[in-house]
């Protein structure tokens, strides 16, 4: 487990997708704004809760000493900036009660913390996770292609829908169904919604590629490195569901303009993984805190130029699609 978790960090920083769909969407500038910069409101609402800022540090790691070091850096950044942090899958701690890589309130007691578990795990383990972590919400991740590419991965999937229904009805905190960089299709969202899930992180292709990571760990299926749909493609495909479910976006988000494009396409909030991981691995924590705080001001600047006071108003912004996105239905 430890080596696999460390491999994930190592290879996540190496791969760069040859295509980023955010470059194929262009927002229409407004020349006569209605609001002052000081009027702009970054707050958002999802999973039954209000949040001051519309982006969060998404699930990445844990379960090793390297993972602990990364998590502690991320926790300090999240606490200092007031954004939510989601830990990586809690499965390592369930297997090893001595694992302390998730005990992040000891690092930052004011941390807004959520956590993550795989849908292959029965609901009893999800309940244990919530009891031990006391998270704001629980992400339940689906990663079928990653599992199939892992020599030690799961091969039994018929229980997943049953597990999901049980998570939706038996977990005492909000449950978010999360992809892991392959993108979530509309039919899966509809099915999960029917099973009781209201909030989805569609986590599209464009950032961390677990197909690439598993291939680097010894696989030979590099032709699957770019499997799945991009975040923008998933958001476009899910337009008809935006009034029925809550959509969060992650995957390939590089900067505040990419975040804004997600909000324009209906996302309630945006998760960042690799972008933040690169920062904490490259810079001192204080500088990363300054960068993340800077993102808040940059979001306000872009929103002001788009004549939008709130995140919700961004859904009314006009945009142009180019390249591959012109083919998305």
UniProtKB/Swiss-Prot annotation:
Could you tell me the EC number(s) of this protein? 5.3.3.2
Catalytic activity, as annotated: isopentenyl diphosphate = dimethylallyl diphosphate
Q: Which residues bind FMN?
A: 59-61, 89, 116, 178, 203, 208, 252-254, 273-274
Q: Which domain of life is it from?
A: Bacteria
Q: Which UniProt keywords apply?
A: Cytoplasm, Flavoprotein, FMN, Isomerase, Isoprene biosynthesis, Magnesium, Metal-binding, NADP
Q: Which cofactor does it need?
A: FMN; NADPH; Mg(2+)
Top EC category = isomerase
Name the positions where substrate binds. Answer: 4-5, 146
**For binding Mg(2+), which residues are annotated in this chain's numbering?**
147
The entry sums up its family as follows: Belongs to the IPP isomerase type 2 family.
* UniProt xrefs under NCBIfam families: IPP_isom_2
* Record protein name field: Isopentenyl-diphosphate delta-isomerase
Task: Identify the coding gene.
Answer: fni
């Amino acid at each position: 487990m430890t080596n696999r978790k460390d491999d994930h960090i190592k290879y996540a920083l190496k791969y760069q997708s040859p295509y980023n769909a955010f470059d194929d969407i262009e927002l229409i500038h407004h020349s006569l704004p209605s609001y002052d910069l000081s009027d702009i409101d970054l707050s958002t609402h999802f999973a039954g809760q209000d949040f001051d800022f519309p982006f969060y540090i998404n699930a990445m790691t844990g379960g090793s000493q390297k993972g602990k070091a990364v998590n502690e850096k991320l926790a300090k950044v999240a606490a200092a900036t007031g954004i939510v942090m989601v830990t990586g899958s809690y499965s390592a701690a369930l297997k090893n009660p001595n694992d302390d890589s998730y005990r992040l309130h000891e690092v930052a007691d004011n941390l807004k913390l959520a956590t993550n578990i795989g849908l292959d795990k029965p609901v009893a383990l999800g309940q244990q996770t919530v009891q031990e972590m006391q998270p704001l919400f629980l992400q339940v991740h689906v990663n079928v292609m990653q599992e199939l590419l892992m020599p030690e991965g799961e091969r039994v999937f018929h229980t997943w829908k049953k597990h999901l229904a049980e998570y939706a009805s038996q977990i005492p905190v909000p449950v978010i169904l999360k992809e892991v960089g392959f993108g979530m299709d509309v039919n899966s969202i509809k099915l999960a919604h029917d099973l009781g899930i209201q909030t989805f992180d569609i986590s599209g292709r464009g950032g961390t590629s677990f197909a690439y990571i598993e291939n680097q760990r010894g696989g030979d299926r590099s032709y699957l490195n770019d499997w799945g749909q991009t975040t923008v493609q998933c958001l476009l495909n899910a337009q008809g569901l935006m009034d029925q479910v809550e959509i969060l976006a992650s995957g390939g988000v590089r900067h505040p303009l990419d975040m804004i494009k997600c909000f324009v396409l209906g996302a309630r909030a945006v998760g960042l993984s690799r972008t933040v991981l690169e920062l904490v691995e490259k810079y001192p924590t204080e500088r990363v805190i300054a960068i993340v705080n800077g993102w808040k001001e940059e979001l306000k600047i872009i929103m002001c130029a788009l004549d939008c006071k709130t995140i919700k108003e961004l859904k009314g912004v006009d945009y142009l699609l180019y390249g591959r996105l012109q083919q998305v239905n």
